[in-house]
Structures are given as C-alpha cells and as structure tokens.
From Swiss-Prot:
<dbReference type="GO" id="GO:0046872">
    <property type="term" value="F:metal ion binding"/>
</dbReference>
<comment type="similarity">
    <text>Belongs to the bacterial solute-binding protein 7 family.</text>
</comment>
<dbReference type="GO" id="GO:0042803">
    <property type="term" value="F:protein homodimerization activity"/>
</dbReference>
<dbReference type="Pfam" id="PF03480">
    <property type="entry name" value="DctP"/>
</dbReference>
<feature type="binding site">
    <location>
        <position position="214"/>
    </location>
    <ligand>
        <name>Na(+)</name>
    </ligand>
</feature>
<dbReference type="GO" id="GO:0055085">
    <property type="term" value="P:transmembrane transport"/>
</dbReference>
<dbReference type="InterPro" id="IPR038404">
    <property type="entry name" value="TRAP_DctP_sf"/>
</dbReference>
<keyword id="KW-0915">Sodium</keyword>
<feature type="binding site">
    <location>
        <position position="156"/>
    </location>
    <ligand>
        <name>Na(+)</name>
    </ligand>
</feature>
<keyword id="KW-0479">Metal-binding</keyword>
<comment type="subunit">
    <text>Homodimer. The complex comprises the extracytoplasmic solute receptor protein TakP, and the two transmembrane proteins TakQ and TakM.</text>
</comment>
<keyword id="KW-0813">Transport</keyword>
<keyword id="KW-0732">Signal</keyword>
<comment type="function">
    <text>Part of the tripartite ATP-independent periplasmic (TRAP) transport system TakPQM involved in the uptake of alpha-keto acids. This protein specifically binds alpha-keto acids including pyruvate, oxobutyrate, oxovalerate and 4-methyl-2-oxovalerate. Ligand-binding affinity increases with the increasing chain length of the aliphatic backbone of the ligand. Is not able to bind alpha-ketoglutarate.</text>
</comment>
<dbReference type="GO" id="GO:0046942">
    <property type="term" value="P:carboxylic acid transport"/>
</dbReference>
<dbReference type="GO" id="GO:0031317">
    <property type="term" value="C:tripartite ATP-independent periplasmic transporter complex"/>
</dbReference>
<dbReference type="GO" id="GO:0042597">
    <property type="term" value="C:periplasmic space"/>
</dbReference>
Length: 365
C-alpha cells in the first residue's frame, strides 16, 4: 500500500470511528441545562457574544445534551451582581469581569485587570502556563466559584474627555466615570471618581455632570456615541492593559458534571477566550478610523500623567499587599511574570511592531 492510499484509508477509518462514537456518546451523555447571567448588554455584541460562543460549542459537541441558556445583563440579575448569583446558586454560571467585585474583595480584580499589569498576551500566558487559573480558583473557592478565562479586549483606551488634560494639575477636580482600582489610583491625583451605570453615561457627559468616562475601545465606544459629547479620546487605558473576562461557575454545579463535560466546558471556555480578542483586533481598526472621521481627536496621556499614575498605583498595591494575604499571593505571581514578560517583549516584538508602524505612518503599507 502506498503512503497516499494509507493516509486516505486512515482518514476514512477515523471519520467512521468518530461517526460511530458520536451517537454512542450522545446516547450515554446526561442532559444538562444551565443558565448563564451575562454582565453585558446584547448591544455590545463582541463581549456579550463570548457567552454565546460557549453555549454554541457545548451544544454542538454534545448533540444538544449540554445546554447553556445565555441571558443579558438585567434579564435575570443586575450585571454587576452576576458573580453573587453564581455564589448563591441562583444561576449556574456567569460571564463577567472580576474587577466588578472589587468592593467585595480587591483580589477578585487581579486575574481580570489592574493598573499597569500584563498585556493580553502576557495575562493569557500567566493564566494558562503560569499557574494563574489555579491561583485564582484557590481564592474563588471560598465564594463557591470555579472560573476560567472567557475573553479579552486587548489593551483598552483611556477614555473620553470633554477637555484636554496634559498635566497632573489638569486632573484636579476632574469628575470621571471610573471605578475600582483605577478610581482609587486616580483619586490620589485629584480625580473625583464617579460610579455610573453604562446606560447613564452619555447623558451625564452631555450635561456636564461628569467630565470624562472610560469604557472599552473604539468598536464598543462608537456604538454608545460618546464622541458626540466628549471629543478627546485618550490612550492607553493603563488600568486595563489586557483585561480578562471570566466564565464563573458555581463550584458545586461544576463538580457535579461528568469528567467529559468538565473537559468540554474548559475547552469551550478557551475557544471563547481566544475568539473575543481576535474579534476586537479585527473590528477596532475600522472603528478607530470611523471615529476620527467623525471628529474624534486622539490624544496620548502625557509621560508626566502616566508616571504619576504608575507611582500612585504602586502605593495602592503596597497597602493592599500589607493587609490582604490572598491579594499578595496572586499579585506576587503576576509581578514576577510581568518582569520576565516585558524583558522579552521589548526585544523582538516591540522592535518589529515599531518598525512596521514607521512604515505605516510613511504610507508604505
């Protein structure tokens, strides 16, 4: 038998075996129906869609035996209470961001996004190969939660401002919709953090109730129309260098799954995680050009502002580490890898990207 014939027959044989195995698996697989509470509205299709990717993959892999029904923010529980509903068993799972629960325990935020942490590539490396998933779940177990990465936006923008800010002095008295760790850091520089629900941000900006707001990035931000009332779009979002969205599962419900279903669930989470970042990388370039065409003025945060924010963030970290052992354990792990990651990132990746950006700006791409 020649090699080509052997490969063809092997492929056919493998396909036949899979076809025979699939019905057998379907017949023996238990029926599971879960509800997932998303922290996001359906209008933000890329980030909300992460849960739909998970649901679709699980249904297809189990011939419909493992179903996860996805509900948008507010349909079952308020978006910022999704993890609480999982802890209590009101729902089996949620799709949310850990920093929403900063007030419960700042440790929730570490595996999601905190100031001057890792990039999307860096945080993914830490999660999957640096023990990050296990460290986070060790902490979450006290809340009856098991979590896996379920999406990443890439580094976010720094927000929409009604006026320019060029120095730290310009931040004094600035009313900005920003919360959690970032709000605590900015407060030290004179900013007055505001907690405002997503649907109330636009009118607050329009009326001047707030001077600025952070959100996500070009694709999502354009949909909300902030450019119409706040022309200055600053970058980067130093508090969200690689924000991870998580799928959080009720620990008892997760442990009640068969080993096969647990494996399929983790695989689907991983696929949804990768897919979201790919979508944002695909959609943001078009969106940023559209925003600029509509009058948006892009502005980088000045080195003075970034350095001041970095120093203030380190002060907050020191306070957290001194008072919260769980926070310190995870942050120590992230810090150690952050140093290694940026040692490598500044060599090949940074120089390649820098060269290509020069070519782009010269009109050669």
């Amino acid at each position: 038998m020649d090699r080509r014939s052997f490969i063809t027959k092997a492929a056919v044989g493998g396909a036949a075996a899979s076809a025979l195995a699939a019905p057998a698996l379907a017949q023996s697989a238990p029926k599971v129906t879960w509800r997932l509470a998303s922290s996001f509205p359906k209008s933000l299709d890329t980030i909300f869609g992460g849960a739909e990717v998970l649901s679709k993959m699980l249904s297809e892999a189990t011939d419909g035996n493992f179903q996860i029904q996805v509900f948008s923010a507010g349909e079952l529980v308020p978006g910022l209470q999704a993890a609480d509903a999982v802890t209590e068993g009101t729902v089996e799972c949620c799709h949310t961001v850990g920093y929403y629960y900063w007030g419960k325990d700042p440790t929730f935020a570490l595996a999601a996004a905190v100031p001057f942490s890792l990039s999307a590539r860096g945080i993914n490396a830490w999660h999957y190969h640096g023990g990050g998933i296990d460290l986070y779940n060790e902490f979450l177990s006290q809340h009856n939660i098991v979590a896996f990465p379920g999406g990443n936006t890439g580094v976010q923008m720094g927000g929409w401002f009604r006026r320019e800010i060029n120095t730290v002095a310009d931040m004094q008295g600035l009313k900005m919709r920003v919360g959690g760790f970032a709000g605590k850091v900015m407060e030290r520089l004179g900013v007055v953090p505001q907690q405002i629900a997503g649907g109330d941000i636009y009118p607050a900006l329009e009326k001047g109730t707030i001077d600025a707001t952070e959100w996500v990035g070009p694709y999502d931000d354009e949909k909300l129309g902030f450019f119409k009332v706040a022309p200055y779009y600053y970058y980067p979002g130093w508090w969200e260098g690689g924000p991870t969205v998580h799928f959080m599962f009720n620990k008892s419900a997760y442990e009640g799954l068969t080993p096969t279903y647990q494996s399929l669930l983790r695989t689907a989470c991983h696929a949804a995680d990768a897919n979201m970042l790919q979508l944002y990388d695909w959609k943001n370039p078009t969106a940023i050009k559209s925003l600029v065409a509509q009058g948006t003025q892009l502005r980088p945060f000045s080195p003075e502002i970034l350095q001041a924010c970095f120093e203030a963030a380190n002060e907050v970290y020191a306070e957290m580490e001194a008072s919260n052992p769980a926070f310190k354990k995870i942050w120590d792990s992230i810090k150690a890898f952050r140093s290694e990651h940026y040692t490598w990132a500044q060599i090949a990746e940074y120089n390649y990207d820098t060269f290509m950006m020069v070519q782009q700006n010269a009109g050669k791409l």
